[in-house]
C-alpha cells in the first residue's frame, strides 16, 4: 500500500482506484470527512497499483473524496462500523481537462525530501511527444540538445526504476509506456557521491504484454543521417516479469566540418577539416527478469549487449599538405547483474537490498593515415572488465525517521595493446594495464521535524586505489591512493502550511550542502593518442587525481509557476583540458587533461511554467552564471547568461506544434573562449487511434549561428569555427500496444547501462 494515515489502531478502510477501463490510477488523493462535525482525516496517496488504506477510523458516517488531475472528482457517503474494503473505486475521465493544454504542475508533486514526481500516464502534454521533448516541460529538468540533466548539473544519472541506463536507451522509451517520473534533486549516497541528480522512470502497471514499436529517422543537406527502429516489451505473469529493450540501426551517419586558424610568431596558417562517421549497423538489447518467490522477496537477473561497426573518414588540408585518416572500429559492450531485495515484514517498507553487476568491453580499431601520397597504419585495442557490489540497508525507525546505510566495492581491469605508426610517429606503440579499486561506506539519517520541516544528514567514506603499469617503459608507472570523508546535509521547509498542498498553494524552500569528490573521466587517464586532423591531437594523463568540491544550493518553488534556484560551488584541483603547442611539430597542437587550479561559481536560475492561454503552455528559464577560475599564471573571471524557452501550442485535442529556442552569451574558461550562440527548433506532432499511433516531425535548426572558439597560448593563438549543417528534419513514429491481463505491482524493473569514454579535447 502507498500510505497509512494516523495511528495503527481502530477501523481500517481500503480500496483500489481505477479508471473506466479498469487501469489503476496512481497518486490520487483520498480523503475522509466526518458528516456530523466536518472533521477531516489526513489524506493518503494511492500507490502504483491504485491501492490506498486509511486506518484509526472511528464508527460513524463519512464522505469519501478522491481527486486526481485528469479525472472527475469522486464523492461518496459511507457508514463505517467495521473494517471496510471498497474494492474498485472507478473515476471517470475529465473531458475538459484532457482537451486543453494543462499546466504541468497539476501533474506533479514535491515530496518532503525534495523529489519531484511527474505523472506521465494520462498527461495531455505527453501526447504525440517523444520522451526527450516531454522532459522539456518538466520542472527541475534541463534539456540542452540531446543531453538531459537535473537543474543543468553535471553527473545526472538516468534510471529505469532501480537500474541505471544510458541517455541513449532512455530516448527509446515512449511516454505511453511510462507511469510517472521521479526527479530526485537530492539523491542519497546509494547513487554515489557527487551525483548532480537522478531521473527515475517508472513503467506502467497495466497490460499482460505492454509494448512499443518505434522508428527514428533524420535527414539533412548531408543526406540520410539516421534510421533507427526499436522494440520495447514488458510482460508479466504470476510471480515472473520480463522486460526487453531492443534497438537497432539501419543507417547512422554524422558529418562535421571546421576551419581552424593558427597564429604563431605572427605567421597565420589555415586548416580545413571534414569528418564523416558512419555506423555500419549496430544492435543493442537489454533483457531483465524479475522473480518474486514470496511477497517479501524480489530477485532480478539482467543482461545486455551492444554490438556495432563504425567507420570514420577525416580529410584535413592547410593548402600545402593533405592528410586523410580512415578508421574502422568494432566495439562490443556486454553486461550482467543480479539484485536481491527483501522486505522485513509484509506491511513494512524497511528492506535489505543487494546489487552486484559486471560490465565488459572489447574494442578494436584499425587506423590508416595517408599524408600526401605516403601511407602508414596503426591498430588500437583494449579489453575492460568492471565489477561492482553494493549492499544497502533501509530502516524505517518510526513514522518520521529513516536510517540508511551501505557499502561499496568496485574493481576495474583494463588492458591495452596498441601498434603504432612506423613512419609518421602519429601513434606510439602501447602496452599498458590500468586497474582501480574502490572502497566505500555510508550512512544517512532523515527525519521530519513537526509537520513541515524535513532534514537529512549523510556521512560518506570513499577510497580509490589506481594502478598504471607501462609494459614498455616502467618509468611511466603510477600508483595512487586517495580517500576522504564527505559529509552532506539537506533540509526542506514546506511554507504552504499544508502537508499535501495543491499545486496552486505549493510553497517550498530547500537547502543543501555537500562536500564531494569527482574522479576524472577514465579515458582522460589513458596515454592514448587520438588525432582530430592534420595539426591537432589529444592525449590522456595517467597522473590525474580527483577534484574536490564544496557545493551549496537553495531551491524555492512558489505556487505552480515559479522556481528559483541558486547554486554556489567551490572546487579545487580541477581537471581542465589544456591545449599546448607541440614542441616537436611545427603548427601542431595537442590537448591534455591536467589538474589545474580552482574555481568559484555562482549560478542563479529563474524558471517560469504556466498556461498562457488554453492552447499555449510555456516553460521558460533564465540562468545567470558568474565563474572565476584560476591556475598558476592565468585566471579568468566572467559572467554569462543562458536563456531557453519551450512552448507547446495545442491546435486540437490530438494535434499541436512546439517551438524551442535557446541562446547563450560568450563564455570563458581556463581552456578556451566560446562565442555566444542561439538556436531555434520547431516540430509538429499528432496522436491517433486512441493514442496508439504517435507521429512527431521536427525541423531542427530553423535558424542558428556558427560560434567561434578561441584558445590562447604562449606566443600563439588558435581559432576554430564549425561549418557543419545544423539544420535537419527528424521523424519519430511509435505504435503502442497491449495484450493480456493487467500487471500489478510494477516495482523495481531493472535494465542495463554501459560506461562511456570521453576523448580529452574541445
Model-assigned labels for residue ranges:
Residues 282-309, 327-473, 482-488, 492-510, ...:
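Face-selective signature of the C-terminal outer-membrane beta-barrel domain
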Residues 36-51:
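Short, acidic Ser/Thr/Gly-rich low-complexity loop/linker segments typical of extracellular
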Amino acid at each position: 500500500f502507498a500510505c497509512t494515515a494516523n495511528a495503527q489502531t481502530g477501523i481500517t478502510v481500503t480500496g483500489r482506484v481505477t479508471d473506466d477501463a479498469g487501469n489503476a490510477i496512481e497518486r490520487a488523493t483520498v480523503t475522509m470527512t466526518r458528516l456530523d462535525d466536518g472533521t477531516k482525516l489526513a489524506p493518503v496517496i494511492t500507490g502504483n497499483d491504485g491501492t490506498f488504506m486509511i486506518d484509526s477510523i472511528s464508527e460513524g458516517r463519512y464522505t469519501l473524496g478522491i481527486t486526481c488531475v485528469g479525472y472527475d472528482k469522486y464523492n461518496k457517503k459511507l457508514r463505517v462500523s467495521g473494517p471496510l474494503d471498497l474494492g474498485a473505486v472507478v473515476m471517470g475521465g475529465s473531458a475538459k481537462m484532457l482537451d486543453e493544454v494543462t499546466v504541468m504542475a497539476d501533474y506533479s508533486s514535491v515530496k518532503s525530501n525534495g523529489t519531484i514526481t511527474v505523472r506521465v500516464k494520462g498527461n495531455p502534454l505527453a501526447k504525440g511527444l517523444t520522451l526527450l521533448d516531454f522532459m522539456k516541460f518538466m520542472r527541475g529538468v534541463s534539456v540542452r540538445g540531446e543531453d538531459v540533466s537535473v537543474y543543468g548539473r553535471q553527473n545526472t544519472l538516468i534510471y529505469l526504476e532501480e537500474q541505471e541506463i544510458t541517455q541513449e536507451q532512455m530516448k527509446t522509451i515512449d511516454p505511453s509506456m511510462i507511469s510517472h517520473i521521479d526527479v530526485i534533486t537530492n539523491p542519497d549516497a546509494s547513487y554515489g557521491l557527487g551525483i548532480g541528480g537522478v531521473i527515475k522512470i517508472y513503467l506502467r502497471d497495466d497490460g499482460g504484454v505492454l509494448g512499443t514499436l518505434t522508428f527514428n529517422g533524420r535527414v539533412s543537406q548531408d543526406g540520410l543521417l539516421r534510421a533507427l527502429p526499436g522494440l520495447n516489451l514488458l510482460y508479466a505473469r504470476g510471480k515472473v516479469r520480463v522486460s526487453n529493450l531492443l534497438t537497432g540501426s539501419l543507417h547512422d551517419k554524422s558529418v562535421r566540418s571546421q576551419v581552424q586558424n593558427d597564429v604563431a610568431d605572427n605567421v597565420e596558417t589555415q586548416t580545413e577539416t571534414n569528418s564523416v562517421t558512419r555506423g555500419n549497423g549496430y544492435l543493442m538489447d537489454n533483457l531483465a527478469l524479475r522473480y518474486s518467490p514470496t511477497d517479501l522477496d524480489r530477485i532480478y537477473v539482467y543482461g545486455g549487449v551492444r554490438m556495432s561497426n563504425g567507420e570514420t573518414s577525416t580529410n584535413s588540408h592547410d593548402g600545402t599538405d593533405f592528410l586523410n585518416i580512415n578508421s574502422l572500429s568494432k566495439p562490443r559492450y556486454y553486461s550482467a547483474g543480479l539484485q536481491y531485495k527483501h522486505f522485513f515484514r509484509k506491511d513494512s517498507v524497511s528492506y535489505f537490498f543487494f546489487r552486484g553487476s559486471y560490465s565488459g568491453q572489447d574494442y578494436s580499431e584499425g587506423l590508416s593515415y595517408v599524408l600526401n601520397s605516403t601511407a602508414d597504419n596503426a591498430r588500437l585495442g583494449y579489453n575492460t572488465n568492471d565489477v561492482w557490489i553494493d549492499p544497502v540497508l533501509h530502516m524505517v525507525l518510526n513514522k518520521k525517521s529513516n536510517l540508511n546505510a551501505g557499502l561499496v566495492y568496485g574493481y576495474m581491469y583494463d588492458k591495452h595493446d596498441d601498434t603504432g605508426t612506423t613512419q609518421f610517429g602519429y601513434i606510439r606503440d602501447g602496452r599498458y594495464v590500468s586497474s582501480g579499486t574502490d572502497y566505500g561506506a555510508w550512512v544517512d539519517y532523515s527525519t521530519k521535524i513537526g509537520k513541515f520541516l524535513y532534514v537529512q544528514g549523510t556521512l560518506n567514506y570513499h577510497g580509490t586505489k589506481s594502478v598504471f603499469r607501462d609494459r614498455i617503459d616502467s618509468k611511466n608507472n603510477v600508483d595512487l591512493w586517495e580517500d576522504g570523508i564527505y559529509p552532506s546535509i539537506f533540509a526542506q521547509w514546506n511554507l504552504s502550511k499544508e502537508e499535501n498542498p495543491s499545486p496552486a498553494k505549493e510553497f517550498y524552500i530547500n537547502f543543501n550542502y555537500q562536500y564531494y569528490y569527482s574522479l576524472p573521466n577514465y579515458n582522460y587517464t589513458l596515454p592514448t593518442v587520438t588525432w582530430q586532423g592534420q595539426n591537432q591531437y589529444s592525449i590522456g594523463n595517467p597522473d590525474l587525481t580527483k577534484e574536490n568540491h564544496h557545493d551549496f544550493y537553495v531551491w524555492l518553488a512558489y505556487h505552480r509557476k515559479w522556481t528559483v534556484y541558486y547554486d554556489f560551488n567551490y572546487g579545487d584541483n580541477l581537471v581542465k583540458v589544456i591545449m599546448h603547442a607541440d614542441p616537436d611539430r611545427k603548427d601542431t597542437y595537442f590537448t591534455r587533461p591536467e589538474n589545474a587550479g580552482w574555481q568559484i561559481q555562482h549560478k542563479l536560475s529563474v524558471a517560469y511554467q504556466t498556461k498562457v492561454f488554453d492552447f499555449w503552455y510555456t516553460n521558460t528559464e533564465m540562468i545567470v552564471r558568474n565563474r572565476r577560475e584560476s591556475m598558476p599564471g592565468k585566471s579568468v573571471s566572467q559572467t554569462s547568461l543562458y536563456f531557453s524557452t519551450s512552448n507547446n501550442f495545442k491546435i486540437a485535442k490530438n494535434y499541436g506544434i512546439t517551438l524551442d529556442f535557446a541562446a547563450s552569451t560568450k563564455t570563458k574558461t581556463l581552456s578556451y573562449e566560446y562565442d555566444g550562440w542561439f538556436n531555434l527548433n520547431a516540430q509538429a506532432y499528432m496522436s491517433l487511434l486512441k493514442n496508439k499511433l504517435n507521429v512527431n516531425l521536427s525541423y531542427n535548426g530553423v535558424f542558428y549561428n556558427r560560434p567561434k572558439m578561441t584558445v590562447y597560448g604562449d606566443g600563439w593563438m588558435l581559432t576554430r569555427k564549425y561549418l557543419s549543417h545544423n539544420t535537419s528534419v527528424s521523424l519519430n513514429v511509435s505504435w503502442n500496444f497491449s495484450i493480456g491481463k493487467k500487471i500489478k505491482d510494477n516495482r523495481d524493473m531493472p535494465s542495463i547501462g554501459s560506461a562511456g569514454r570521453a576523448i580529452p579535447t574541445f
